[in-house]
Amino acid sequence: MQGIKKRFAAVLAAALVVLTGCSSRKAASSSRTEDLPDTLSAEEVELPDNKAAYRCTSYQYEDDELVCKYFQDFDDHDNIIRSETAGDPENMELTKLYSYTYDKNGNVTAKTQSYAAPPSTDRDIYFHDRFCYYDDGTLKYHVNYTKDSDSGLWKKNYRKEYDSHGSEVLYISYNSDGSTNYRSETQCEYDSSGNLAKETWHSDGSSMVSEYTYDGAGNILTAVRTESSEDSDESFVYKTEYAYDSRGNLIKETKTDPYDVTVSTEYEYDETDRLIYKDIIGTGSDVHTTYRYEYEKISG
């Protein structure tokens, strides 16, 4: 979503959302639509050895009691390359591993996601993604592949297309034989500053309209999503409100669902604008969840 500005994207990244490598625009040097075929051979799915530049350690608390500790390593492009839990090996989650291929301008052209089950370090590859860009580095196409166990080929799982602003306008998922399983389209409208003002999503008789407002700095202030269906006269409205500090960092996000259940998330940062604390307060939950984040340099 092009209208949600860099500070908001950085918060989500620091809050452990895996990047696709397209959060900033860089001139594209080598990506072409024809580089995204329907199938890939096993030899075409590479696992580059991306080096960790820094680590984020996050601590999850419920009602002030530590319930989980996570380690996440990032490369020097700020993309996550490893995510694992710490603690009792029998209760540990799968370790997630990510490998990236970059063009000369730093755009991600391929990403591979694999898993390892502790204490084993053997990797099982689950997903492979390919990306291509407009000339200015804005993401244009994204194809996700999964491995066919019979043929050993990597086949298209889904495909996304984006407009020149970087907003998703088409999504298609595929069956194992290559036929279309699901399709959705989105029409996007922009304000005079180029911010995404409205997007209308359609698929199989259902629709969803999202409208956005911004402050003078281009930070998103409100997002209102209305969902409806041809089979019903009812519609459902979801609203999210955002607040920022003087440096443009997102400090509060409040979500309200159609039943007036509200969840607020507050964020705190260090002097270099890195996320160090997240506090989730929900009217529909008896559990108070917080996260604390620490960073350490690994290389470079």
Model-based region annotation:
Residues 27-300:
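Buried hydrophobic residues that stabilize the cores of well-folded domains
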